[in-house]
Amino acid sequence: MPLSRELQRRFVHSYIEQIASEREGRVPNGVYETSVVSFVFNHERIEGSSLTEWQTRTVFETRDTVLADSTTPGNVRETANHTKMFDFLFDSLDRELTPEFIKEIHLQLMAGVMDVPGQWKILGNGVGSVITARPEEVPTLIDCLVSEYNKYEPSLENIVRFHVRFETIHPFPDGNGRVGRAIAFRECLRAGLVPFIVTDASKETYYTSLDEFRAGVTTPLISYAEAMQVDFASTIAPMLADRSLSDSLLGKLGIERPDFKDDAGFVGPSTKSLKSSLDSVGKTGSEIKSDHKTHCTRRV
């Protein structure tokens, strides 16, 4: 990760403040909207949702559970719930991770979608060839997992390790992947670490790395999480209101901010040469109005 812990801490502090400000003012296309749409679209998409990014944005903007052009109302309901769950994660950053809190996340996500949201599974389930916990084992295993996690200083490695164990237990009937990724996102923020979103485009790497971690090869999944941290920071950094921090982040990430100069690459004679041409055929310079001058310099 090219960003120091201190720079990550500053990023998270600024990010949380800007999320709160933009939520209140409903700023379009800002840090908040960009984060929610990316978080929800990708984490729903890799679970099989058919909604496009545009449809996801529409659900976010309207907070509606019905899309006229959607033939999968269940996807819409889950997407609407997911956007609310994102807000819940931020509203609860001061709360320690507990089994009951994990159930609350699941309730936010699956309300109106399944009969018993926010409750551990009562029937067995599986993830491909992975052997998950039996229903009667879930309460004890989750209690132990959370208790052990909370004993140690938060770090990306510990967050990733928690995520793998949570997904292997698979404590809910459905929604385990989305809840697990939501926990990882929130715990990164609580730890002052740049959060990461598992993208639909990188899901094969994610799933392969999960399997490798279960087999004892931990480096690939941690490296994947670090790469997704860089991806997230690269997207958000140019949009931060704190220009000094934004520039520091972009510099460390090796990203050059666009330079909006007067010379925008337009072709043809300049107003000065045009004036000369007009004068040469008997026109006066007064016919070229001063208020037609173009100034393209823009602060970003």
Task: Tell where the protein language model's regions lie, with residue ranges.
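FIC/Doc superfamily catalytic core
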Residues: M1-D174, R178-V300
